[in-house]
Design a protein with these regions (language model features):
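ATP-dependent adenylation/nucleotidyltransferase module used to activate substrates
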Residues: 1-196, 326-328, 334-339, 345-347
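AMP-forming adenylation/ATP pyrophosphatase catalytic core
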Residues: 147, 151-347
Length: 347
C-alpha cells in the first residue's frame, strides 16, 4: 500500500483555508494544519480582556477548523522573526500598516521550513486569485512562491486551474482535474463548495483577523513609532495598543485609560512598568503614563483621569500618582471639562 503524500496547510480559521484542506483530504492527502502567532492576531485577545460580549461563546477559529476537518493543528510563535516583516516590508504596506504581500511570503516561508523539518511534501493555502487587492493577485502569487522558497511545492487548490502546474500536480500526487478555478471577490463559489462538503458554519476573519488592517490600530502603532523615534516594538507594546483609550495630550507622553473593569484588571498587570494614576475619591479607571511627565503635566493628567471617573461632575476628585521611582503623590483637582479634551488627543 502506498504511503499518502503529506501536505501542510496554512489554516487561518476562515472558510477558504478550510476548503483548501478539505479538497486535499478528499484526494487522499495526509493534511496537517499550521497557524502562526504574530502578536497582531485579533482572535481572542480583546474578547478575553473586555467584559463586553463576554456571554457570547468565543472560539479559536483555527483550532475549530482543524477539529471540523479532523486534522492536527500546529500553532507556531513567530513574534520575533515577524518583526522585520512589519518594520521593513519589501513590498510596502496596504491601506493601513498591513504588509500583506510580505506577510504571505513570510508565512509560506515558515511553512516551507516546517515542511522540510517534518518530512512533508508540499504546502497548501486557501488563496483565491483576485480575492485580496495586495497579496492575492495573479501577478503577486509567483512572488510569494519565489520569495518564500516554496516554488512549485506551493499549491493553491481553490484557484489552481488558473495557475501553472505545481510539483504535486505534475507528479500525480494531486489530480488537477479535481481542483478549482475560483477567481474574484465573490464568495458564492466557496459557499457552494462548503455546502457540498456539508459545512454550515465558518468564521469570517478575512482581513479582520489581523489588527494591522485596522485603521484605528494602525494609527496608534504609527503614533508609537513616531513618539519613540524607532519602529522597534515588544509584545507588550502591541498588546497594549489593543486595550483602553489612548490619548496623547503632549508629544512626550501618552495615556492609556481603561474603559471598563476587564481592561482595568489587565492594565493592573503593568503598574510596575509604567507610572500610573488611580482615583481615590471616586470610582474610575487606572491610567498608565507612557512617557515622562514634565512640569505642569501631572495636574493635567490627574484632571483627565477625573474626567473619566465617576466624579466627572464633582467639583474636585482626589487621585494618586505613582511614578516608576519615588513615593506616590495624592492630588485633588477639578475634573477636566469635556470641552477642554480636544478630539486631536484621542488616538
Amino acid at each position: 500500500m502506498n504511503t499518502p503524500r503529506k501536505a501542510v496547510a496554512l489554516i487561518s480559521g476562515g472558510l477558504d483555508s478550510m476548503l483548501a484542506a478539505r479538497v486535499m483530504l478528499e484526494q487522499g492527502i495526509h493534511v496537517e494544519g499550521i497557524n502562526f502567532f504574530t502578536g497582531f492576531c485579533v482572535e481572542g485577545h480583546t474578547h478575553a480582556i473586555r467584559r463586553q460580549d463576554r456571554a457570547k461563546p468565543k472560539r479559536n477559529n483555527a483550532l475549530w477548523v482543524a477539529e471540523q476537518l479532523g486534522i492536527r493543528l500546529h500553532i507556531v510563535d513567530v513574534i520575533e522573526p515577524y518583526k522585520d516583516v512589519v518594520i521593513n516590508p519589501k513590498h510596502g504596506y496596504g491601506q493601513n500598516l498591513n504588509p500583506c504581500l510580505d506577510c504571505k511570503g513570510f508565512m509560506v516561508g515558515q511553512a516551507r521550513a516546517w515542511m522540510e523539518e517534518h518530512g512533508f511534501d508540499f504546502i497548501i493555502t486557501g488563496e483565491v486569485i483576485g480575492q485580496r487587492p495586495m497579496s492575492q493577485r495573479k501577478q503577486t502569487m509567483p512572488i510569494v512562491a519565489r520569495e518564500s522558497g516554496a516554488f512549485d511545492r506551493l499549491l493553491r487548490p481553490l484557484c489552481a486551474k488558473l495557475l501553472p502546474e505545481t510539483l504535486p500536480e505534475r507528479e500525480g500526487w494531486v489530480d488537477r482535474a479535481r481542483l478549482y478555478d475560483f477567481n474574484g471577490r465573490s464568495r458564492k463559489p466557496q459557499q457552494a463548495l462548503a455546502a457540498r462538503f456539508g459545512f454550515t458554519d465558518w468564521a469570517q476573519p478575512a482581513g479582520g483577523c489581523c489588527f494591522l488592517t485596522d485603521p484605528n490600530y494602525s494609527h496608534k502603532l504609527a503614533d508609537l513609532w513616531q513618539a519613540r523615534g524607532t519602529k522597534l516594538y515588544e509584545l507588550d507594546d502591541i498588546m497594549l495598543l489593543k486595550v483602553g483609550r489612548h490619548l496623547r495630550p503632549r508629544p512626550h507622553f501618552k495615556l492609556i485609560v481603561a474603559r471598563e473593569d476587564g481592561e482595568n484588571n489587565f492594565l493592573l498587570g503593568y503598574r510596575r512598568q509604567f507610572a500610573h494614576l488611580e482615583p481615590l475619591s471616586h470610582g474610575g479607571p487606572l491610567v498608565l503614563v507612557d512617557g515622562v511627565l514634565q512640569d505642569g503635566d501631572l495636574e493635567l493628567v490627574a484632571r483627565i483621569l477625573g474626567r473619566y471617573s465617576q466624579g466627572r461632575e464633582a467639583p474636585a476628585v482626589t487621585v494618586r500618582y505613582t511614578p516608576l521611582a519615588g513615593p506616590a503623590q495624592d492630588l485633588t483637582v477639578p475634573p477636566l471639562p469635556v470641552q477642554e479634551l480636544p478630539v486631536e488627543w484621542h488616538l
